[in-house]
Amino acid sequence: MAEGGAGFSSSSTSSEEAVPWSTQQPMGWEELESLGDGGGSTSADEEFQWEAMFVKSRAGSPTAEDKSRTFTLPRGRPKNEPRPERGKGKTPKKPKKPDQGATLLVGEEPRPRLGSRTRSKSRSRDKHQLPDDIYDVPNPPMLAPVDSYGNPVEQVSSSESDFEDIANIRPILRRQQPVTVKHRREPSPEPLGHPTFVHRYDKPSYDEEVCQKKDKGGRTKSKNWLRQPGVKSKLTSMKDLSGSFKSLMHIRSDGEKHKQQQRPGGSGAPGGATPRDVFNTFLGSGTCPSFKNAFFLYLEGSMGVGKTTLIRHMREINGDNVISFVEPMFYWREVYSDCVKLIYSACKPFNLGKMSTSNKVLSAQMKFMTPMKCLQTSVRRYVKANEPLQEKTAMDNWLLFDRHPLSATLVFPYLSLKNGYLAFEHFLALAANFTAHEGDIIALLCMGEEDNLKMVKLRNRKGESGVTSAHLKDLGQAFHACYCTWLLLKYLSPEDMVSVCCCDVTLNDICIMRSMSSSKVTMAKSLFNKSMFPTLMDVIQPFRSNCTIIEICLTLFMELKKVEFIVVNASEFIGDIPGVWTSIYTQSLRTQAIKTQSIDWSGLRAFSLTYNS
């Protein structure tokens, strides 16, 4: 014990400043005396043993002098060490002791290294860090946030509101002295001058390009990415963005709207109604309704037979007693697609029997049907409710319609079916949409195919340049087949014809059951062969027992029986529009089954003006 203590004391008396406890040995250092001739020096291999000794020494009872000692790592340069002067060379490095850099002795302060670069505090603290039960290293103070100019800024509490953060920072910014900083873009690397990297806001306007061409010398900045973005370029980009949005939403621009206003029959035509005016007509005229009896006359027939010309003529000579509804050509050609062009392009000889062709024909016929069924529904709002059909007089008024839903749902699909452009299922889907009302009068204008072709060429309507006389002949036969179907339903009930089409009952059996004369039986057989019934029977033959098929046939026959037909040979009245009207007027008064309906005349007239505009 004495030798170990003497040896330790002798090695430490050379520098009493380094070993402050040389005069008095503290209690609890039994391990130091047991080492023998250690000389107080340590090596890298003994570092872990010294740490264990330091931890164990805390178990003893230190003296008052030990309590006053503080084992902290210095955070700066020692006060007694001179600072090296600039310009006089580098300070010579002191020789490194062999025991330096391993473990600090009690009371020894580590000497910082001098040089161009000083070790960071975190590395020094990690290297010389001692257990927590020896001493507590104080935490470094939190760095105060600063702004872009180096001024301290108060910490802003975390909040989800952007306005709250701005309100907390604003008082500090007001206390700062105003600093004027010229706004300019930082110079970018040369590769950013490539057009790929140039922002579209940096594109120069026309004036800037002219200035660049004039200023060729000097230190003019010609790079676009060095220029400050201008207001004009941003507004141009916003306009381009709005144009893209309009294109996405299919909104017409001002130029297209001007073209639409000049287009006849468009919703934006001069004198046309606004959407609010159109909707108000559906709600009523707002005045007391004035009911009048009127004929519901639908003009039907092939194209070019004079339907539109007759409506225009009657509206001019007798406008007070006539309300007309023109053909919805604008909806067919301008709304989303041109169904007239589609039907003519699909019905080509090389497209026979293709399902894709049938899909196109179905799509076109559905668009033909849509405005007619909508008009039919709209007009029924002005018919006096729960009012039976009225007996006609010579002074009754007239409602003239350009085509009935019959053509779009039955006649033209029947023609496409016969020619091989429409599938069976698509024909039944269109026929199931046919509807009619009691009191509907269909004036069928017939004309020979040669005369009809001349009329089509004369009017020169868009999309009808490829119409042939064979097509007009087939179309006339389709209308005649529909007329024969309706005429046969005048002799036999719809239930009887469903039995013939869907059941194993012949037409002869039905005539015998109804006790019909031989002349009527012959007439019924002739009408049956010319009607749509034979074709319909071939279509539904594989599925005659299906409930949906039976319901389609029954509804079709019942709806078709509601209308009344008037047939006019228009070939006899070519160029004689009053003659065509005289024939229609005379047959309407002579046919007992034709009756009139009571309608709100003033409200329906207002609606017709809106519809035709």
UniProtKB/Swiss-Prot annotation:
Keyword ATP-binding set for record: yes
Q: Where is the sequence biased in composition, kind Low complexity?
A: 8-18
Annotated residues for binding of ATP: G301, S302, M303, G304, V305, G306, K307, T308
Annotated active site? E327 (proton acceptor)
Where is this chain compositionally biased, Basic residues type? 114-126
Cite the Pfam families for this sequence: Herpes_TK (PF00693), Herpes_TK_C (PF08465)
Region annotation (Disordered) maps to 1-233, 253-276
> Known EC number(s)?
2.7.1.21
The protein's matches in HAMAP family, at most eight in alphabetical order, are given as:
HSV_KITH
What is this protein's record name? Answer: Thymidine kinase
Q: Which organism is it from?
A: Equine herpesvirus 2 (strain 86/87)
Taxonomy-wise, where does this protein's organism fall, top ranks first? Viruses, Duplodnaviria, Heunggongvirae, Peploviricota, Herviviricetes
